[in-house]
From Swiss-Prot:
<dbReference type="Pfam" id="PF17125">
    <property type="entry name" value="Methyltr_RsmF_N"/>
</dbReference>
<dbReference type="InterPro" id="IPR029063">
    <property type="entry name" value="SAM-dependent_MTases_sf"/>
</dbReference>
<dbReference type="InterPro" id="IPR011023">
    <property type="entry name" value="Nop2p"/>
</dbReference>
<dbReference type="GO" id="GO:0003723">
    <property type="term" value="F:RNA binding"/>
</dbReference>
<dbReference type="GO" id="GO:0009383">
    <property type="term" value="F:rRNA (cytosine-C5-)-methyltransferase activity"/>
</dbReference>
<comment type="function">
    <text>Specifically methylates the cytosine at position 1407 (m5C1407) of 16S rRNA.</text>
</comment>
<keyword id="KW-0808">Transferase</keyword>
<keyword id="KW-0698">rRNA processing</keyword>
<feature type="active site" description="Nucleophile">
    <location>
        <position position="247"/>
    </location>
</feature>
<comment type="similarity">
    <text>Belongs to the class I-like SAM-binding methyltransferase superfamily. RsmB/NOP family.</text>
</comment>
<dbReference type="InterPro" id="IPR031341">
    <property type="entry name" value="Methyltr_RsmF_N"/>
</dbReference>
<keyword id="KW-0949">S-adenosyl-L-methionine</keyword>
<feature type="binding site">
    <location>
        <position position="194"/>
    </location>
    <ligand>
        <name>S-adenosyl-L-methionine</name>
    </ligand>
</feature>
<keyword id="KW-0694">RNA-binding</keyword>
<dbReference type="InterPro" id="IPR023267">
    <property type="entry name" value="RCMT"/>
</dbReference>
<dbReference type="InterPro" id="IPR049560">
    <property type="entry name" value="MeTrfase_RsmB-F_NOP2_cat"/>
</dbReference>
<dbReference type="InterPro" id="IPR027391">
    <property type="entry name" value="Nol1_Nop2_Fmu_2"/>
</dbReference>
Length: 479
């Protein structure tokens, strides 16, 4: 693999020499940083099994190497990378996999280690969504996830990735993560804080990542991280699990933040060692039981992961003085809910008791039951999935609901050819050789739901959302 030139400030190199364990070679560290990052993907088990995904992609000649800490994760090598971007493959467009850096799969592996099965989880800094979607897959779309993102521009990307992966158990918020300890005390079984950091571990992806690096900046970031972990710890229930992670390498933003929390709440913080998380984890193990992953150890990004347990309650923070405002939704009454469920089933949309129907004006939504305890305590940017809009003739089913809820075995399912599927993703109407019988058609490709179409004569009217329409080269290689 070709080398690329990474910018290293002298003070950073000095700091890394001091931080690196004697068992590791500093020259190996420098050499690893100069190598471009290996591409990696995670199979979305909400949509397909790993075995079925491997069978589906076998004809492509992709080389898929298992990632030791994530059984759904693979490093990927492709001969056709220049001809077709990974994000334009049919399997990516239909949500069968997520392009995710291997080391960023570690925090969720730690969160669910040792049989941990949380029912209400918070992802404090969630965009662009790799870890939220990984958590949802581990929970099998059950329970509830609060996915928060402070950056307004990234909330939209977060929602798009959640929708593409067919996730229904997520509520989105847009706050500074420091508010949750006061706003939602002891409300979560598990919390992931993948903290904003100095990004020292990402130089293999971005050779200029350290252009603005300074020791002073590390200290400022660490101060924010301490406030974030303190807030998250307050929001965690007694007995719950907190995973703290960064994509940086200095101790100030990593071990020191966790040690500060333990010094602050000595009787409530227990470090849970990660040496048995996967075979070979001990190569990155610190004396505290954290994983401090230098890039040469597993040939991935630099990363840090710590797992903590809250052993007892801690004094509550002052109750916030802000007003949440009126919640604009109301539960759907039983009789109407039965009608909606029957109408939805007729086009192949079904859901279980983890979701409940709510309405706002002419909109019908499905919210995860596990999030209802938070209503009135925090303002949501988006909650659950929008199922339908009502109109004179019935319901206008929404694309995100089709992707999350549709069964490809429904009698109205209509399988497209590769060329027809590509036309669909380009936002064009489809003219199949043999038109389906039903008026509302569940459009599938590779036996995966990709949308809902209206049959008008021999034409399938495209309903693919305009903001998702793709240009350029797609999977049939026709631009």
């Amino acid at each position: 693999m070709a080398q690329h030139t990474v910018y290293f400030p002298d003070a950073f190199l000095t700091q890394m020499r001091e931080a690196m364990p004697s068992t590791l070679s500093f020259d190996d560290f420098l050499a690893a940083c100069q190598r471009p990052l290996r591409r990696s993907i995670r199979v979305n088990t909400l949509k397909t099994s790993v075995a079925d995904f491997l069978r589906l992609t076998a004809p492509y000649g992709w080389t898929l190497t298992p990632i030791p800490w994530c059984e759904e994760g693979f490093w990927i090598e492709r001969d056709d990378e220049d001809a077709l971007p990974l994000g334009s493959t049919a399997e990516h467009l239909s949500g069968l996999f997520y392009i995710q850096e291997a080391s960023s799969m570690l925090p969720v592996a730690a969160l669910f280690a040792d049989g941990n099965a949380p029912q209400r989880v918070m992802d404090v800094a969630a965009a662009p969504g790799s870890k939220t979607t990984q958590i949802a897959a581990r929970m099998n779309n059950e329970g509830a996830i609060l996915a928060n993102e402070f950056s307004a521009s990234r909330v939209k990307v977060l929602h798009a990735n959640i929708s593409r992966c067919g996730i229904s158990n997520v509520a989105l918020t847009h706050f500074d993560g420091r508010v949750f300890g006061a706003a939602l005390p002891e409300m979560f079984d598990a919390i992931l804080l993948d903290a904003p950091c100095s990004g020292e571990g990402v130089v293999r992806k971005d050779p200029d990542a350290l252009k603005n690096w300074s020791p002073e900046s590390n200290q400022e970031i660490a101060a924010t991280q301490r406030e974030l972990i303190d807030s998250a710890f307050h929001a965690l229930r007694s007995g719950g699990t907190l995973v703290y992670s960064t994509c940086t390498l200095n101790r100030e933003e990593n071990e020191s933040v966790c040690l500060w929390l333990k010094e602050t709440y000595p009787d409530a913080v227990e470090f849970l060692p990660l040496g048995d998380l996967f075979p070979g984890a001990n190569k990155a193990l610190t004396e505290e039981g954290f994983l401090h992953v230098f890039p040469q150890i597993y040939d991935c990004e630099g990363f840090f992961v710590a797992r903590l347990r809250k052993t007892q309650a801690i004094p509550a923070l002052p109750t916030p003085k802000y007003k949440v405002g009126n919640f604009p939704f109301s539960p759907v009454k039983d009789r109407e809910a039965a009608q909606i469920r029957q109408a939805a089933a007729s086009v192949g949309l079904n859901w279980d008791g983890n979701l409940r129907l709510w309405q706002r004006d002419k909109e019908v939504w499905l919210f995860p039951v596990g999030i209802e305890a938070l209503i009135g305590k925090v303002r949501f940017s988006r909650l659950g999935i929008k199922l339908a809009e009502t109109h004179n003739k019935g319901y206008r089913w929404q694309h995100e609901a089709v992707i999350a809820l549709a069964s490809p075995d429904n009698e109205n399912a209509f399988e497209l050819t590769p060329q027809e599927a590509e036309e669909w993703y380009r936002g064009r109407d489809v003219y199949p050789q043999a038109a389906p019988v039903a008026d509302d058609v569940l459009v599938t490709f590779q036996h995966q739901p990709i949308g809902l179409a209206k049959r008008i004569g021999s034409r399938l009217k495209n309903s693919y959302p305009r903001e998702l329409v793709r240009d350029g080269k797609l999977f049939t290689s026709n631009a």
